[in-house]
């Protein structure tokens, strides 16, 4: 199969899985780029960040139109996540300057940890939602949201992973927003965060523009198909199987054979 066709196919398959399960693009895309297409982890991270920026724009606009976005929350998160992302990308540049290709080992370890943590969170999400339903928020104000943004921005700057899963879980735990508002607010914030992160990664030379274009060509129809199939397949079991696969992938990154 020609290389360009393989990249488009990867974008299509990941788009279908995202559309069907709602599992974030970073945790699905990065392992395929690294293990499947053979990209260095640092280029995979940078390219994935820019890819996610473009893929989240349509959903963000739709949520704004539907009124499912807390704009003040987006602002508070962004006040933390933008400097956090800047710090994360700068740390990658610094590690590469000191250790050369050792930065790729560092990224694999960081992504491996996230591929253990995030699927575990997703598997437990339903139980957590049921336990805290109708509970009063345990945190209030911009400061707490900005800290959440700072933490997630730093992680995304390092790995391009975790924007959706981690922010949604933290908003759920500490602010008790309705799920629909959580999703809309997270998606619009992700547009801002990945826009900044993608630009920083591009400036650092960590983006393969041709890869990003090929992935987008495949992911757009893939996402539409996945959304169409979401009501026609046993999504709960598919999501669980996907989480188990991600856990195995994370273990492989942490403990390679």
Each model region followed by its residue ranges:
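Juxtamembrane transmembrane-helix termini in multi-pass membrane transport proteins
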Residues: 24-74
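Transmembrane alpha-helix interface/packing and boundary motifs in multi-pass membrane proteins
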Residues: 11-22, 150-160
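Juxtamembrane transmembrane-helix boundary motif
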Residues: 1-10, 35, 65-152, 203-257
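Transmembrane helix boundary and interhelical junction motifs in multipass membrane proteins
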Residues: 22-30, 159-168
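Transmembrane helix-bundle signature of multi-pass membrane transporters/permeases
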Residues: 45-53, 78-82, 186-191, 219-220, ...
């Amino acid at each position: 199969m020609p290389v360009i066709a393989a990249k488009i196919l990867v974008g299509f398959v990941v788009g279908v899985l995202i559309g069907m399960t709602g599992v974030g693009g970073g945790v699905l895309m990065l392992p395929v780029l690294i293990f499947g297409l053979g990209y260095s982890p640092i280029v995979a991270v940078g390219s994935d960040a820019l890819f996610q920026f473009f893929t989240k724009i349509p959903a963000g606009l739709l949520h704004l139109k539907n009124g499912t976005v807390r704009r003040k929350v987006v602002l508070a998160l962004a006040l933390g996540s933008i400097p956090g992302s800047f710090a994360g990308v700068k740390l990658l540049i610094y590690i590469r300057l000191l250790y050369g290709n050792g930065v790729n080992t560092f990224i694999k370890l960081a992504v491996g940890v996230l591929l253990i943590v995030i699927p575990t969170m997703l598997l437990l999400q339903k139980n957590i939602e049921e336990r805290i339903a109708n509970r009063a928020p345990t945190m209030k104000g911009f400061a707490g949201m900005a800290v959440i943004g700072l933490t997630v921005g730093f992680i995304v700057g390092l790995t391009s992973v975790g924007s959706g899963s981690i922010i949604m879980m933290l908003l759920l735990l500490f602010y008790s927003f309705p799920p629909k508002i959580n999703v809309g607010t997270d998606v619009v914030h992700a547009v801002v965060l990945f826009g900044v992160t993608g630009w920083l990664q591009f400036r650092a030379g960590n983006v393969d523009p041709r890869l990003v274009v090929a992935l987008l060509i495949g992911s757009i129809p893939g996402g539409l198909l996945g959304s169409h199939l979401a009501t026609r397949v046993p999504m709960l079991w598919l999501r669980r199987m996907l989480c188990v696969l991600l856990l195995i992938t994370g273990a492989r990154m942490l403990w390679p054979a």
